[in-house]
Amino acid sequence: KDYVFLNYLRCHDDIGWGLDYEWLKQFGIAEAPHKKYLNDYFRGYVEGSDARGELYNDDPVLQDARLCGTTASLCGLEAAGFEQNEEKTAQAIQRIEMLNAYLFIQSGIPVIYSGDEIGQVNDYSYKESEDYDRRSDSRYIHRGHFRWDLEPAKDKKGTVQNRIFASMKKMEELKFKYRPFDGEADVWTEETYDTALLCVCRKSGNEMVTGIFNFSNEDRTAWIDMGEFTWKDLFTGEKRVLRGV
């Protein structure tokens, strides 16, 4: 191939929602209200959302704005920690793990933004800066210093930092170990018959990897049928048939 992608969940900059709205029109999705919904959801302004983020370059005339926040905060870990809610903490970690798995199954090189490996949340200290440009720039909410005080916790089994870091290390090992993660592998999607579920398949030689990603907040069933073959869950080692999972 003539190129290799660098893939990331978050970086130093804002999220602009650069979606193909010409294509999305066929599904009745209009740009301005859809972006508003996304920005409201990821600020925790929608019922059921535990996300925490802030707007950047909000333009009320164009009804357009960009979003800022760390992966962990946008996935609900900050709110769960504030509430000291273990169930919500577990759900937030599951979201982070799912998104990282989606990152690692892509062709290319996964890039981890500093702090994401330990679930670092938003840093609001920029609002107290003596520098006007800094305190008026919400992008600094996800540009905080690395939390070295939390780094040792990644090696303590059961901590939030350990659960996130260990899962990422496992994904890294799998990406190096199995041929289907190679950049030359064939990649395609399978129909799941559920708009909240995405099934990505990768194949190289006689080896194949299938990833099923649930973007909802509840258990769903992917109505896929991969025949009578026995598959192994690369995370748990469990063996099963991939049919209605």
Where would I find each of the regions flagged by the language model?
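Active-site and adjacent substrate-binding regions of carbohydrate-active enzymes
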Residues: 1-245
